[in-house]
UniProtKB/Swiss-Prot annotation:
Biological function: Hydrolyzes adenosine 5'-monophosphoramidate substrates such as AMP-morpholidate, AMP-N-alanine methyl ester, AMP-alpha-acetyl lysine methyl ester and AMP-NH2. Plays a role in the regulation of kinase KIN28 function. Essential for growth on galactose media at elevated temperatures.
Organism (species): Saccharomyces cerevisiae (strain ATCC 204508 / S288c)
Keywords: Hydrolase, Magnesium, Nucleotide-binding
Additional remarks: Present with 5410 molecules/cell in log phase SD medium.
Subunit text: Homodimer. Interacts with KIN28.
Gene expressing this chain: HNT1
Listed cofactors: Mg(2+)
Reactions this protein catalyses: adenosine 5'-phosphoramidate + H2O = AMP + NH4(+)
Pfam families assigned: HIT
Molecular-function annotations in GO: adenosine 5'-monophosphoramidase activity; nucleotide binding
EC number(s) from the headed UniProt entry: 3.-.-.-
Intervals of motif Histidine triad motif: 114-118
Protein name (Swiss-Prot/TrEMBL): Adenosine 5'-monophosphoramidase HNT1
Length: 158
């Protein structure tokens, strides 16, 4: 199979640890070095690389080496590994302002069905992630009821 992108600076080394992957997933193919990437950091549980369709210079993706479409599908040890990598990348890029973004599901703007975290530098008002959503008026009675319901559900969960 011919690589999608070919350049001498792309990484195609074998991954550092076995993982639960999906043969059809583009991110799993990157982890397995079937597709080259601009790899930045690789650990036993995670793989970080530069996004090839960046929102800003330095836009990176951090992906668990475990295939799962949604955050709740991923074992904790893989999730625990991701944020220190985001921190390390932000420090390496000397970022004072940035976004860490993670979407779950198509209508939540997830484009690849493999959990991933975006580290998006925000160097000025026009570059990087531009977010705007309508804030709702707070109904404190409704919010209090939701709070109690969630606490009850959390009591019986991990």
């Amino acid at each position: 199979m011919e690589p999608l992108i070919s350049a001498p600076y792309l990484t195609t080394t074998k991954m550092s640890a076995p993982a639960t992957l999906d043969a059809a997933c583009i991110f799993c193919k990157i982890i397995k070095s079937e597709i080259p990437s601009f790899k930045l950091i690789e650990t036993k549980y995670s793989y970080a690389f530069l996004d090839i369709q960046p929102t800003a210079e330095g836009h990176a993706l951090i992906i668990p080496k475990y295939h799962g479409a949604k955050l709740h599908d991923i074992p904790d040890e893989f999730l625990t590994d991701a944020m220190p990598i985001a921190k390390r990348l932000a420090k390496a890029m000397k970022l004072d302002t940035y976004n860490v973004l993670q979407n779950n599901g198509k209508i939540a703007h997830q484009e690849v069905d493999h959990v991933h975290f975006h580290l998006i530098p925000k160097r000025d008002e026009k570059s990087g992630l531009i977010v705007g959503w309508p804030a709702q008026e707070t109904d404190f009675d409704k919010l209090g009821k939701l709070h109690k319901e969630l606490l009850a559900k959390l009591e019986g969960s991990d």
